[in-house]
A protein has these predicted regions:
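Short, flexible loop/turn elements at secondary-structure junctions
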Residues: 119-121, 134, 147-150
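A surface-exposed partner-binding patch
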Residues: 1-123, 172, 176
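A short local loop/turn or secondary-structure capping micro-motif enriched for an aromatic residue
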Residues: 136-138, 152-153
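Low-complexity, glycine/alanine/valine/leucine- and proline-rich hydrophobic stretches
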Residues: 125-136
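N-terminal processing/targeting junctions
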Residues: 138, 167-175
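Compact, glycine/acidic-enriched structural inserts
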Residues: 144-147, 154-170
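Short, surface-exposed beta-strand/loop "edge" segments at domain boundaries and coil↔beta transitions
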Residues: 123-127, 150-157
């Protein structure tokens, strides 16, 4: 039995949103689709990411802000996560969709550090990524924030994806300043 997300309700993570469903939420993935996505990406996705996507395969989080002391173009005390890419090929915003990993690496020239899995409200000018630089392509990646407007500065947010998800806060907890 998995020890990932012990005592945590994964169904509470996702917000109902028809636009995100249409563009980011993939159908449930099979082991074959997961293997094909990991092969195309060149990285083994962390078990915590896989388990969250098994509940809902992409979309928008209810708690969509991560506290940080690193100022960014969005806010001084947090970063906001928007759409989260599902595991698949069909939806435009899925990991291997038209607006997925290849777009961020090849057209936007984001650094090849791992898997870009979500954006912020800037529409692609800042991304959330699973950073495999220290752990290798099969290891447990950190979660980082990469901001294009700051010369692709990489800011570590969490030591792993589960910690990242557990640390998310609702946007109402932050001021608009």
């Amino acid at each position: 039995m998995s020890q990932v997300f012990k005592d945590f309700d994964l169904s509470s993570v996702w917000e109902a949103n028809s636009w995100a469903d249409e563009n980011y939420k993939e159908a449930p993935f099979t082991p074959e689709i997961l293997a094909a996505v990991e092969s195309e990406l060149g990285y083994k996705l962390p078990q915590s990411f896989i388990e969250l996507m098994a509940v809902q395969n992409g979309g928008i989080f209810v708690k969509n802000c991560f506290p940080t002391t690193q100022r960014n173009s969005w806010a001084k005390d947090h970063v906001q996560i928007c759409e989260v890419s599902g595991i698949g090929f069909e939806k435009e915003g899925s990991l291997c969709g038209a607006m997925g990993q290849k777009l961020w690496l090849e057209e936007w020239e984001y650094p090849p550090i791992g898997v870009y899995f979500a954006n912020d409200p800037s529409g692609g000018h800042a991304m959330f990524a699973l950073d495999y630089r220290e752990c290798g392509k099969d290891g447990e990646p950190k979660v980082v924030f990469v901001e294009q407007e700051s010369d692709f500065e990489i800011v570590e947010l969490a030591p792993d994806f589960e910690t990242f998800i557990r640390s998310l806060r609702h946007e109402d907890e932050f001021s608009d300043e």
